Amino acid sequence: MDIAKEAGPATQGAAQGAESFSAAGHDGHPLSATGDRAADSKGQVSWAVFEWARNPYVLLITIYIFSPYFTNVVVGDPVRGQAIWGNINSIAGFVIACLAPILGAIADSGGRRKPWLAVFVGVMAPATFALWWAMPGPQGLSIETIAVLIVIVAVAFAFSEVFHNSMLPSVAPNNRIGFLSGLGLALGNAGGLFILCFMLYAFMLPGRVSWGFIPDHALFGIDVSAYENSRIAGPISGLWLFFFALPLMLFTPDRPRSKRPGLVDSVRQGGSRVIKTLRELKHYRNVATYLIARMFYNDGQTAILVFGGVYAAGIFHWDALTLTIYGIVLSIFAVGGGFFGGWLDDTFGSKIAILVSIGGTAVGLLLAVSITPTELFFFIPWDPNAPKVWDLPFFATVPELLYVSVVVLIAIFITAAYANSRTMLARLAPATKMSEFFGLYALSGTATAFLGPAIVGFTTSFFQSQRAGFASVLLLLGVGLGLVLLVKEERAEARE
């Protein structure tokens, strides 16, 4: 499942600036939204391929393969593991929240972006590869070392998105920004789905099914008994990122060196812009209410993504094979969520669309935590020894099938909410201040990024229950939903 990109001021400002420049320069070459020569087709596609490079990390490490392995096998206790995973992600979220505005200011200063991207890729690739040595017991990396690696990768991943976003206005022709942005998202989704299918074919199904096209043994000598089919997610993510980041580094043009503000001046100017816009929010209470609402429900949705695989693995004792299929199913249905969100928005308006999406997510989460191997919907007991639905080595019981059905709906609603949220701000913000408010929109997506994981981690530890920890996300969704009800779907008038 792919989280919708939160565009920073540079990206969103391009939407306004596009009309200020002619479609082509004097030499007939298309101009970008910044007025410079746009990249050629190879450079544009290479920019989009960077999403193909980055997205498998999210699915393999953060959601479906490595995180459940870490919490259940390396830590060895699903409850303690979920609490630790919450703490790890809350620390990463806090670092991102503190530094993202500074990095955003540097990116918006107009200097070179590719050196920064090279640094972040250079950090992410080896740190992710090193997760291969995350083994249970004393022979592998310690839990503390693994935690540090995860925090480093998560922070570098978030910062790489800031600089990748900021390249878009100078790479794409001013009439193709939307197309190129969409191409990047599509490639990101496709890359994640492809790598999950490859993991299924190469490492998860061999030896588990007798289908003719499936190898008898895991490829490359992977030893499933040593959990290498889960640990390989680290090296695959790292190598995938490194090699598919190369096209951007080689073929996508960067801005030339110029007399732009230095690092310190860029940070100072960017901070001043953020503070100025925050102060102006008192004149735009309706927009401010929406941004605060979005901050809460976005944190809740992100927490569901981060902990969904961890929770399912702990409650149902799913192995790597089942989790991989689980990820593939959700990724496919999440694509439909984007279309569903668009239909809701066009038919009922952004506010109703968001209310339906958040409400559907909350109801789905409540239903999800109501299902366990011994209980359906909190009140209906279920015999865990009841006959299986089928002989396949995944989703073979009624509770598992019900859980997957509910989580499929959650995936659809979350994707729809991400799509509707950006449209809602476009309907509310003053037309002449769209760039500034989309900058705040991006900031609201990171300002409390630590909150969801922190709540889940604390609640899991306090109640010693994965169900209680996962259910605590309902608090964030509820606050966000309540605040959205207070928002009026009308455009604010700019105040100078």
Task: Name the predicted role of every residue range.
Residues G28-V45, P253-L291, K388-F394:
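Juxtamembrane intracellular "pre-TM" segments in multi-pass secondary transporters
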Residues V121-G140, G359-A396:
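C-terminal ends and interior cores of transmembrane alpha-helices
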Residues W133, F242-L250, I371, F470-E496:
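Multi-pass alpha-helical transporter architecture, strongest
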Residues C98-R112, G337-S350, I371, L376, ...:
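Helix-to-loop junctions at the C-terminal end of transmembrane segments
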Residues S109-V123, D346-G360:
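Cytoplasmic membrane-interface "Motif A"-like loop-to-helix N-cap segments
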Residues F203-L239, W390, T397-V398, F458-L477:
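A membrane-interface helix-boundary motif in multi-pass transporters
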Residues I61-Q82, V306-L323:
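Short amphipathic helix-loop junctions that connect adjacent transmembrane helices
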Residues A127, G140-S160, F379-A416:
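Hydrophobic core of transmembrane alpha-helices in multi-pass small-molecule transporters
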